[in-house]
């Protein structure tokens, strides 16, 4: 996924178009963070506008209330997916209010932290998307592979400990 998001809707669209021209099809897009008090309707209109300008893209919405000031609800995500089933394909959930509660067929869910990887996999999530995976990738991969192979989890506690060490700096 190519992460896009600027302080201007038009710049966001331009960045997505540029990425699309260079072969990217899947984009991680956070709702606008430059307006306070975003509503479900406003966020719906934001994604609708992007899709109207680049209709062939696939979007993983980015739920990160701390950064964007908006927290997706199950209802808001469901409306986006129902309206744009060929475009809205998943959610990165850094707010952690959706990964356990959102149940949509053929919808990718990625918690935004290693601390939720194993639990997420156990309830049907697809994996994680985490900046800290730049450091924890071998451990996260081991947890993922062991889960897929139904092997005993030997690295999850270590993975969580490394992540929590980073969380201490937030």
Where are these regions (language model features)?
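Active-site beta->alpha loop and helix N-cap motifs at the rims of alpha/beta catalytic domains
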Residues: 1-69, 77
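Catalytic alpha/beta core domains of metabolic enzymes, predominantly
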Residues: 49-57, 64-167
């Amino acid at each position: 996924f190519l992460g896009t998001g600027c302080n201007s809707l038009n710049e966001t669209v331009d960045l997505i178009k540029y990425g699309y021209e260079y072969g990217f099809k899947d984009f991680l897009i956070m709702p606008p963070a430059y307006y306070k008090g975003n509503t479900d309707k406003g966020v719906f209109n934001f994604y609708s506008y992007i899709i109207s300008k680049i209709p062939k893209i696939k979007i993983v919405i980015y739920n990160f209330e701390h950064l964007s000031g908006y927290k997706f609800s199950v209802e808001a995500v469901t409306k986006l997916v129902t309206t744009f089933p060929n475009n809205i394909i998943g959610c990165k959930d850094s707010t952690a209010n959706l990964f356990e509660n959102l149940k949509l067929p053929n919808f990718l869910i990625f918690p935004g932290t290693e601390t939720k990887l194993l639990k997420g996999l156990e309830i049907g999530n697809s994996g994680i998307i985490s900046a800290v995976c730049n450091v924890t990738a071998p451990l996260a991969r081991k947890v993922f592979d062991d889960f897929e192979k139904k092997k005993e989890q030997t690295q999850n506690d270590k993975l969580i400990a490394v992540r929590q060490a980073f969380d201490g700096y937030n």
